[in-house]
Every structure is written in structure tokens, then in C-alpha cells.
């Protein structure tokens, strides 16, 4: 994490993309201001680790939507569920950003529609 420390020391806002709770904790201590999790803070301990920091949290829908499903509803429902889990851990809404995960298991047609 020396790169995070060096960039933060220079005044940059550093975002770390990880799903691992121990990396989230270490990155925040090193000066990261944003944690971005392609799994939506869904791995065991990830939501708790993220909530224990002061970082902004990017909740991403990073996998395929079920075939034949309404992709908008599927993505929305997942992001809402993960946001509820974070809010229940005391994370304020102003720390949470949604990323619908364009390019992760979604066709160009689905993204544009």
C-alpha cells in the first residue's frame, strides 16, 4: 500500500478497488478515500470493514443479470439490497455511490436500453 500512502500524501483522492475486508481496512488506514467493490460489499466481513472506515463506498453490480430478467430491476434490486445492508451498519447515504457495472455481464443493448 505504499502507492496509496504516497498519492494520499500528495493530496490525491485515492480509490481502491477490492472485495477483501483486510485490504479495505489497510487501504483506508493508508489514506484511501474511496472503496470500490465489484461484489457490492457482499463477501463475508466486507460490509463491516467498509462501514468501519470514513471512506466513500462504491457499490457495484459486477456480474451477469439473470437471463430473461428485467436488467434494470435486477441491477436496482441488488444495489438497493446492498445499500440497505450498509445503512444497517451505520453508513450514511452520502457515503454510498451506485455503479451499475457497465461492461460486467451486460450487453451493449442492455446498457443502452
Each model region followed by its residue ranges:
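Conserved anion-binding
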Residues: 24, 30, 38-109
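Charged helix-capping and loop-helix junction motifs
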Residues: 1, 76, 111-113
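N-terminal active-site wall of soluble small-molecule enzyme domains
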Residues: 1-34, 38-45
